[in-house]
Amino acid sequence: MAEKRNIFLVGPMGAGKSTIGRHLAQMLHLEFHDSDQEIEQRTGADIAWVFDVEGEEGFRRREAQVIADLSEKQGIVLATGGGSVQSKDIRNHLSARGIVVYLETTIDKQVARTQRDKRRPLLQVDDPREVLESLAEIRNPLYEEIADVIVKTDDQSAKIVANQIIEKLGF
């Protein structure tokens, strides 16, 4: 890998973007960033608080700025927020600045992986499965639209998925 390329991980909540991203960055000797963690660092508050105080629109504005800033770097792996692809500007930005990897998973896996996580504001409802299904209907076509590579994450360890990504990218 002569030039430092950016790798952007997109996909739904619970697909494993952050965990897989850390492994991938380590294996490729790249810097790892997580857009949600970066928002928390910049605001000094957790994502749930940002949602409560600024609403989803305020959160999405912050997310767009963080992704724009981080994607200016060279040689990073960036785990994006699941809803970031709903912004056409962000989709264009990611496509232009690096390789987009869609981490695909089933609704069942999403439910299993997120059921105890109280830090996901959109899932703090009576029926999180219904929310995940609704989000998938909107977002999955957008993930597919910008993906250079699609990798399924069901029933595989983060390390195995990271290796599959490296193999598919030819690194």
Curated annotation (Swiss-Prot):
Subunit structure: Monomer.
Annotated Mg(2+) binding sites: 18
Keyword ATP-binding: yes
UniProt-annotated binding residues for ATP: 14-19, 120, 156
Record-stated family: Belongs to the shikimate kinase family.
Keyword set, alphabetical order: Amino-acid biosynthesis, Aromatic amino acid biosynthesis, ATP-binding, Cytoplasm, Kinase, Magnesium, Metal-binding, Nucleotide-binding, Transferase
Designated gene of the protein: aroK
Protein name stated in the entry: Shikimate kinase
Species name: Shewanella sp. (strain W3-18-1)
